[in-house]
């Protein structure tokens, strides 16, 4: 587990450390973030919960879970950079959000979210049931509505692509995901033990 953590910390440092600064490369930086904050984090948490750090952990279900986690982070992460394009460009950091532009970032994120939802639908149907997917989707409705509201506001006034909206989106989507996962945990574990 320590080795896995060292790898995670090393990539995180490489993302913003002046001598390497993966952040200045749009695709490489984005891939580093989404893989390590998405699929790799899924791997670490799942391995730790199961106390299984062997090759036997890598089942198709777990790999597909890693893919879903990576795609969700891939959809969301560019939105966290949307308000800092000027600051990033002054440092020479040409992030994926900077390259896409503000409107392009919203469109890119929307497409990635749609792909993520298709993957989630397939994942839940394959390993659980569609009812659980619908619970997951319902819990995300407030975040989806806020995303659309923020996008419309930003189209009308580019200054709406700011820190405040980014943090609101972060808080709302995190809260919605947490509630969704708690409900799914309850359905899958607590009800079965009753």
What residue ranges belong to the model's regions?
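Membrane-interface helix termini and inter-helical loops of multi-pass transporters
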Residues: 49-58, 125, 192-194
């Amino acid at each position: 587990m320590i080795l896995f953590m060292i790898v995670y910390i090393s990539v995180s440092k490489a993302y913003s450390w002046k001598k390497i600064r993966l952040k200045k490369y749009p695709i490489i930086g984005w891939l580093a973030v989404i893989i390590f904050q998405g699929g790799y984090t899924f791997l670490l948490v799942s391995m730790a919960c199961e106390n299984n750090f062997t090759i036997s952990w890598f089942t198709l279900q777990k790999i597909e879970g890693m893919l879903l986690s990576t795609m969700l982070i891939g959809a969301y992460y560019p939105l966290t950079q949307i308000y800092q394009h000027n600051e990033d460009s002054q440092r020479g950091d040409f992030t994926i959000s900077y390259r896409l532009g503000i409107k392009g970032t919203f469109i890119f994120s929307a497409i990635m979210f749609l792909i993520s939802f298709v993957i989630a639908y397939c994942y839940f149907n394959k390993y659980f049931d569609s009812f659980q997917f619908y619970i997951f989707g319902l819990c995300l409705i407030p975040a989806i509505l806020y995303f659309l509201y923020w996008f419309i506001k930003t189209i009308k006034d580019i200054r709406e692509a700011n820190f405040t909206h980014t943090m609101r989106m972060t808080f709302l989507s995190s809260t919605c995901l947490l509630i969704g996962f708690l409900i799914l945990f309850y359905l899958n574990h607590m009800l079965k033990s009753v």
